[in-house]
């Protein structure tokens, strides 16, 4: 299932970088359980259009989420919510 993008927007007057605002918004969807493990995120161009940000901004936000283990990217398939890491 492809996850639906939240209705929140980037605050263009905030001193917080756009990529960080986007990362926080996407992470909140995962933490709140609105996006479940295995759900496919919308494409990078869709995220760009929805939030009115550059592809570089989207890639930086997604790259950080991937580094944190929140999402996984599969070349040619898309970006998916990752399975939670076990703490054992």
Where are these regions (language model features)?
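Extreme N-terminal segment that seeds HTH/winged-HTH DNA-binding domains in transcriptional regulators
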Residues: 1-53, 63, 86
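Beta-hairpin "wing" of winged helix-turn-helix
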Residues: 34-39, 67-76, 80-83
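Residues in the helix-turn-helix
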Residues: 57
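DNA-binding alpha-helical recognition surfaces that contact promoter or target DNA
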Residues: 60
């Amino acid at each position: 299932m492809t996850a639906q993008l939240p209705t929140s927007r980037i605050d263009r007057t905030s001193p917080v970088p756009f990529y960080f605002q986007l990362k926080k918004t996407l992470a909140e969807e995962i933490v709140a359980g609105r996006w479940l493990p295995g759900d496919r995120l919308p494409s990078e161009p869709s995220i760009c259009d929805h939030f009115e940000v550059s592809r570089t901004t989207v890639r930086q936000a997604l790259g950080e989420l991937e580094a944190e283990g929140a999402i996984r990217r599969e070349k040619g398939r898309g970006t998916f919510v990752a399975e939670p890491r076990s703490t054992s």
